[in-house]
């Protein structure tokens, strides 16, 4: 197994973790029903990009 030779500094640890942050879900408002939904997802009543898909 690989074992590190030298201790990683707080700065290096922080640089590694800089890409780990989560982003909030992007929300959109449907043009037909005015309902809020996640981007690129079907609304709860079955509309996607203004068309009934479900």
From Swiss-Prot:
Residues 1-54 are annotated as: Disordered. Keywords: Ribonucleoprotein, Ribosomal protein. GO terms for molecular function: structural constituent of ribosome. GO terms for cellular component: large ribosomal subunit. Residues 25-34 have a biased composition (Polar residues). GO terms for biological process: translation. Residues 7-16 have a biased composition (Basic residues). SUPFAM superfamilies: Zn-binding ribosomal proteins. Belongs to the bacterial ribosomal protein bL32 family. This is Large ribosomal subunit protein bL32. It comes from Tolumonas auensis (strain DSM 9187 / NBRC 110442 / TA 4). The gene is rpmF.
């Amino acid at each position: 197994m690989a074992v590190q030779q030298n201790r990683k500094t707080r700065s290096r640890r922080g640089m590694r973790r800089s890409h780990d942050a989560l982003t909030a879900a992007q929300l959109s408002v449907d043009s037909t029903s005015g309902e809020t939904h996640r981007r690129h997802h079907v609304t709860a009543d079955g509309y996607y990009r203004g068309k009934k898909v479900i």
